[in-house]
Amino acid sequence: MAAHGGGGVEEDQAGSSSLCPPAAEAEAAAAAAAIARAARPPRPGRDKRLGVRHPLKHRRFRAGGKAAVAAGAREVGEATTVAEATATGPPKGSDEDDEARYICGGWTSDDGRMSCGYSSFRGRRANMEDFYDIKSSKVDDNQINLFGIFDGHGGSHAAEHLKKHLFENLLKHPSFITDTKSAISETYRKTDSDFLDAETNINREDGSTASTAIFVGNHIYVANVGDSRTVMSKAGKAIALSSDHKPNRKDERKRIENAGGVVTWSGTWRVGGVLAMSRAFGNRFLKRFVVAEPEVQEQEIDDDLEFLILASDGLWDVVSNEHAVAFVKAEEGPEAAARKLAEIAFARGSTDNITCIVVKFLHAKMAVDAASSSERS
């Protein structure tokens, strides 16, 4: 990916070209078949972000209902409150293969204003280090819906910590409703600090991205650290709501070098010759340079806003923003769309874990709610 400066977002960070969804049907069919053939024994892999080989670990991902990939969605279908669901298996309404390499499902918000689909696939990697979280709650009578993708590297500890604690911490922040942007930034930093303090093995270098979409009333707050990404479809156009944190981004490189760090080329641009992203949770020995300070974008929900896509780089490395939006539009609903995105990414040769959330806005329900509110007033 080419370097880009500033803190703004790009319309298509993975490149773009026109793609008619019907022309992709053959690719989609091949993708589904490829997913079905993916149940082969795991093998050691390379963590491309750390640039090192690591042994086969976390065999619990082969243990059916106790798989950590399933843990990423326990709230969905089981509980839509801040409280953690007690179920140890996949969520109700989800599908999981016999070795927990692929899980998908759907969810509709309590207020009926949005629905989502999610898909998480270990893919060609030996280990599953992607986690995700979907929560719904009320704070001071405000309906809150939260969606997050956490893509781990060097191990799954950091991503799992975020899945368990990031939204929990945010919902407890005293300024969450009155100053949401500041609350998000402070919560990201606190959760990073808590993880580093809680990790007893100081030699571990686990890290994780975070791409989150937080819905408060009629506003969306998208925050990101790392190279997971959130893209919206607005009036038919793909628009990125986050900007990947890469070491060769002009502003990021300057920040790292001002802090005494270096950015070097080793297969790709890396911080200290090691990490292929410039911001992350964890990464203790690079913490001075690799910060967990999020960039936060605010977006008002209007009738032109059709859906959001949140995904790990297992999708974005091989599917452009525009193509992802086109694939989602071609599907009947968000659950089928999330599944299709994972299938397409795998068929196109993605070598990473692939996790996607598609959030669709149900504007008819929103209009009814607005009319009812107007009549009461």
UniProtKB/Swiss-Prot annotation:
Residue ranges, annotated region (Disordered): 1-68, 80-99
Binding site for Mn(2+) 1: 151-152
Swiss-Prot/TrEMBL keywords: Hydrolase, Magnesium, Manganese, Metal-binding, Protein phosphatase
GO MF term set: metal ion binding; protein serine/threonine phosphatase activity
Basic residues composition bias: residue spans: 51-63
Gene Ontology BP term (one): signal transduction
Record's protein name: Probable protein phosphatase 2C 7
